[in-house]
Amino acid sequence: MEAVHCFRCYKFPSKQIEFYLTNCMHMFCIECERLCHPPEEEPLKCIQCSKTPIRIVKMGPELPMTIKSMFTPISEEINQYTRDLTRVLTFQHRQRASLSTFLERKVAAFDRLRDAYSEEKTKKEHYKKQLEEAYHLLKSKEHEISKLKKQLAEQAPPPQTPPRSNSLKVASSRSLETPSMMRVFSDSMYETPVQIQRRFTKAQAKAEAEAEAPAKSPGSKAQTTKCTSNYQSHPPASFETPIHHPPKTSMGFTTPANPPHMFPYLKKHEAQREKHKEHRNSQ
């Protein structure tokens, strides 16, 4: 700073001359500074403004920053302030630009949502109107259907119970006389050839005896019951074992319930039955 000088003698600072600064902002050289010290024990007094007491600080690199800033050239201060102000303005401008961009995106999104809401609201009103029309149409159709049903009920004749025909009676009796296929199959499957031959002989003899006996009226209940029981006790011819074929040694209980390991026992049992039959015939 070129304007620094002593307030009393107007000397300029140099390396050989020391300068001092008072708290009342007056500068003195080392010679003038001595005049601020009174001869007696009195407080320091400024020789420029006569202020007392004062504090005196030696000028140099050890000065506080608050005092050094007063000696900085004004151009440097302006440049520093300009740089600081520019940095502050740049920071604030970036903040405002970021916030403005965010708000613009939000406004655009809000506009899109508002348009979508308006479109969905219009669709909802349209669907609601269609639903109301369909509901009224359904009610009218239900009313027409109930009206037509009522008219048909009034025009229809009273129901009559038809008499049961003889054909139904005959069909029911035939269904009762028809043997169970499962029973016939199971009976023929679990009988031995000897038992089948014996049963067939008895049935043939019984049929011959009935043929020789006088025939009864077809409406007899006892005859119908007897024929039904006899018919149900014999399987159809397709399920019977042929009699003219000689029985094989492997014939018998050839079912999953009687595996082949039972054949020796069955063969022995049949041999005993044949032996017992021959003994009875000889007597």
Curated annotation (Swiss-Prot):
RING-type zinc finger span: 6-50
Transmembrane parts of this sequence: none
GO biological process terms, semicolon-separated: chiasma assembly; homologous chromosome pairing at meiosis; meiotic chromosome segregation; reciprocal meiotic recombination
Composition bias type Basic and acidic residues, residue spans: 267-283
Keyword Hydrolase carried by entry: no
Record bears the keyword Metal-binding: yes
Compositionally biased spans, kind Low complexity: 202-216
GO molecular function terms attached to this record: SUMO transferase activity; zinc ion binding
Start and end residues of each stretch annotated as Disordered: 149-175, 201-283
Compartments, as annotated in UniProt: Chromosome
Residue stretches of biased makeup (Polar residues): 163-175, 220-235
Tissue: Expressed in the germline.
Example of a GO cellular component annotation carried by this entry: synaptonemal complex
Superkingdom of source: Eukaryota
UniProt keywords, alphabetically: Chromosome, DNA recombination, Meiosis, Metal-binding, Zinc, Zinc-finger
Description of how the protein assembles with itself and partners: Interacts with zhp-3; the interaction is required for their localization along paired chromosomes and stability, and for the formation of chiasma during meiotic recombination.
The protein's role, per its UniProt record: Recruited co-dependently with zhp-3 to the synaptonemal complex between homologous chromosome pairs to regulate the formation and number of crossover events between homologs during meiotic recombination. In the early stages of pachytene, in complex with zhp-4, recruited by the zhp-1-zhp-2 heterodimer to designated crossover sites along the recombination intermediate to stabilize other pro-crossover factors such as rmh-1, msh-5 and cosa-1. This in turn facilitates crossover and promotes the formation of chiasma in each meiotic nucleus at the late pachytene stage of meiosis.
Protein name according to UniProt: Zip homologous protein 4
Annotated source species: Caenorhabditis elegans
Lineage: Eukaryota, Metazoa, Ecdysozoa, Nematoda, Chromadorea
Gene: zhp-4
